[in-house]
Regions:
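Accessory RNA-recognition modules of RNA-modification enzymes
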Residues: 1-211
Length: 211
């Protein structure tokens, strides 16, 4: 079994078993199942793991913020709203992570105003990337705190230039003072505003607000 060590495990709140080996994680999961339904099942099988349990997550989210005068993108530290800048997450799809890195660079170059949850002011709140594992289609969702998105046409054009593999780009508008990532309104900026993927022979349409 291949093992890698996450450099963010002591600060990031996304992975609760990041300090254990993958083998230990599988054992712990089996023990959890046994503790819940063991009295009903005599023979609980071992958990089936992956040979390479990394870069498998095809829904990748990052929140934007500022560290001093620098724009950062990452995830919240556990139990806080302190953003931990993430450059290379070991469980996120590598292609999605690269797109988020590019979006962060473009935010800086286009001087997009980052949303401040304390003051309720600013434009860009989050970025979400979804990837169809069978179709390889990619959706980028830019979550803004208002309908206005300065330089959006040039922003989208440059993002597509750097990542021609992107299928669709959507602006999601979340004007609420809430910890919820997505709002209810979606505005396609490029493409159809959704992607499709195939699972068990069935084709599904995936929107920004899908599971």
């Amino acid at each position: 079994m291949i093992q890698e060590k996450c450099p963010y495990v002591e600060k990031c709140g996304a992975c609760h078993m990041g300090q254990t080996t993958y083998e230990e994680e599988l054992i712990a999961k089996k023990e959890l199942v046994e503790s819940h339904i063991g009295k009903y099942c005599r023979n609980i099988h071992d958990v089936a793991g992956m040979y390479y349990p990394f870069h498998y997550r095809n829904k990748v989210h990052a929140v934007f913020g500022r560290l001093k005068d620098e724009v950062i993108a990452g995830t919240y530290s556990e139990g806080t709203h302190t953003i931990v800048p993430i450059d290379n997450c070991l469980i996120e799809d590598a292609q999605a992570s690269a797109i988020i890195k590019t979006v962060t660079e473009l935010v800086k170059s286009f001087k997009i105003w980052i949303y401040n949850e304390d003051t309720g002011r600013g434009v860009l709140r989050h970025v979400l990337v979804r990837k169809g594992m069978s179709t390889k289609q990619i959706m980028v969702v830019l979550v803004t705190a208002c309908p206005e998105f300065p330089h959006k046409n040039n922003f989208v054009a440059e993002l597509r230039k750097r990542h021609p593999e992107i299928t669709t780009i959507v602006q999601n508008i979340n004007e609420a003072n809430t910890t919820m990532v997505l709002g209810e309104r979606n505005k396609p900026l490029y493409g159809e505003g959704y992607i499709e993927d195939v699972l068990c022979g069935l084709r599904f349409r995936i929107s920004p607000n899908s599971f």
